Design a protein with these regions (language model features):
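Beta-propeller domain segments
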Residues: 1-169
């Protein structure tokens, strides 16, 4: 019954949108999220995208699908992890010495591909940043060739420098 890790789609009175497909709480639009920082709606079609903190500098942008699963599963004894406190590995220290971005991403993957209803990320930082911020779509002619593109803030620089030139078309 918790709403943690979920994106809700409700009306102004807090009632569930009648088109939501989640089988449990009818207010739920998507589930399986770790730490959503922002939701932006693409102007061309109104589709919702989330900017989300992943573990170990493994952040994602995801196009939401009604009833879809974000894929977050912080289970222990996967990806090289041993037993974790309270059987939850989502908040282990994220600065392991000598771990490359790829090894960190495999250690606690943001999107667990075992889920058949997984919403695959539209973008993943591959372990190179430290926390996505809010997101927005650029609107107006002043943006030139970038009009209609999505931007997301990065709250810190991770290992290997800043990812540059990455975008969602």
């Amino acid at each position: 019954d918790l709403i943690a890790g979920k994106v809700l789609r409700i009306d102004g009175d807090g009632n569930a949108h009648p088109g939501n497909k989640f089988k449990g709480d009818k207010r739920v639009y998507t589930y399986g999220h770790r730490n959503v920082q922002g939701i932006a709606f693409r102007p061309s079609d109104g589709r919702a995208f989330t900017a989300e903190h992943g573990p170990w500098h493994n952040d994602e942008i995801t196009a939401l699908v009604n009833g879809g699963n974000g894929g977050w599963d912080p289970a222990e004894k996967r990806g090289g992890r041993s037993a974790c406190p309270d059987k939850y590995c989502g908040y282990e220290p994220n600065q392991k010495e000598g771990m490359t971005p790829a090894v960190r991403a495999a250690y606690t993957p943001m999107s667990d591909t075992r889920f058949k209803d997984l919403m695959p990320p539209a973008w993943n930082n591959n372990g190179y940043s430290q926390g996505t911020g809010s997101a927005a779509f650029l609107k107006g002619k002043k943006w030139g060739i970038y009009e209609g593109r999505m931007v997301a803030g990065i709250m810190g620089i991770g290992f290997g420098g800043t990812p540059s030139g990455l975008r969602i078309d």
